[in-house]
Amino acid sequence: MASALSCSASDLIPLLSGGANATAAAAAAEYICGRFDTVAGKFTDAAYAIDNTYLLFSAYLVFAMQLGFAMLCAGSVRAKNTMNIMLTNVIDAAAGGLFYYLFGFAFAFGSPSNGFIGKHFFGMYDFPQPTFDYPYFLYQWTFAIAAAGITSGSIAERTQFVAYLIYSSFLTGLVYPIVSHWFWSSDGWASPARSENLLFQSGVIDFAGSGVVHMVGGIAGLWGALIEGPRIGRFGVGGKPVTLRGHSATLVVLGTFLLWFGWYGFNPGSFATIFKAYGETPGSSFYGQWSAVGRTAVTTTLAGCTAALTTLFGKRLIDGYWNVTDVCNGLLGGFAAITSGCSVVEPWAALVCGFVAAWVLMGCNRLAEKLQFDDPLEAAQLHGGCGAWGIIFTGLFAEKRYIAEIFGGDPNRPFGLLMGGGGRLLAAHVVQILVITGWVSVTMGTLFFILHKLKLLRIPAEDEIAGVDPTSHGGLAYMYTEDEIRNGIMVRRVGGDNDPNVGV
């Protein structure tokens, strides 16, 4: 907006002189324009400060999601593994911060670069730049550690701590940054912000990361859980699934609400700026990015709410009871799905997104049980499956006007197939699903396989039965009295004396 504020002394002189004393009029015009330029400069500074404050606040919201992940994970595992899963969430943030600082941000946004990987800003050298300031680094770091946090849930309760440390560093330092470069850097080969040679003339519109964050974390978790195998006792004779319930639905609900709160930084915050005008529109005197930010918060909310209610009634029909943890996962599945297209779809379309996301999650969970795939937090199904649906959804429902406002460029660029925009955007999004699946499978799948062969991945069976907390972390997360221990409240054997699974 500041660029529209300008002053021309030559235009002012005739107005000030009135045909006399042109020298004085010229001096007055120069003075007025000088003062005007000073005000315009301060206006530009204010806009910059507002945008950076908005981005910092969004980063703080997304970082708060780490607490949500920690609470969700803690409530979803058995009490004997609580300290372990909490520590992994802390390590995700700490190791991720160091490796994203050293390598990750450079690989993701180091410009000038090629279409595959960035090659500038290692260790934040030569930083900040006019295009990237410190708040942007902080914001992108919170996304990187979110992807790592997703993976930790898939391999919970049976993984050596050193494996967490290795995979978290590798994911945040290399695997995730390269994917984010492809789709979010202006140099990325599939970025919608490219100035030329857009993929299918549209690029990939993965606004806040259904693919970049959720699919990356979900597929990494898929490979980790596949290579490790299910937890002891998860499947009985003949492959019959045995429910290993988490120890605290209270923590699951707390974590879900913290994640919901943080998603208002995750999706609306991905605009990175808020002080930007789009111009006048019918029915309003002024219209800008602040309106798009608000719409994005609304679509995010509606998708999550619809998915939660769909899961509530869907699971009631399938299983015959109301389950709060299933509803929480359904809600998060709706959020993961809408993350791609939250900024470019109408609110009514978000209802479709959430409804389908709930059934995708329930279907993936049913398939996982049939294949004897064990993911304690349903992270691979939720983030991988619902994330993939969100990418497809955007290719179907993205609105032409919103794409033009946010990404600019050719006003006739492809948009959603069901909105009359042809199939090019959808084709680009199918490519995104394929390349993310391939890249993460090759990198993270190989890493987990190497850790498995080196016997650094899974803990010994006796430690798994006893619990990771007492065997690896110096004790349990909760204090128990002698009476509670004697009465079997702390540790009890599930399914009889011959059942190898010990519940807590």
From Swiss-Prot:
Phosphothreonine modified-residue sites: T471
Molecular-function GO term, any one: ammonium channel activity
Main location class: membrane
Subcellular location as annotated: Cell membrane
Keyword Phosphoprotein appears in the UniProt entry: yes
Statement: the UniProt record of this protein carries the keyword Cell membrane: yes
This protein's GO CC annotations: plasma membrane; plasmodesma
Similarity section: Belongs to the ammonia transporter channel (TC 1.A.11.2) family.
Task performed by this protein: High affinity ammonium transporter in the plasma membrane.
This protein's name: Ammonium transporter 1 member 4
Organism per entry: Arabidopsis thaliana
Lineage: Eukaryota, Viridiplantae, Streptophyta, Embryophyta, Tracheophyta
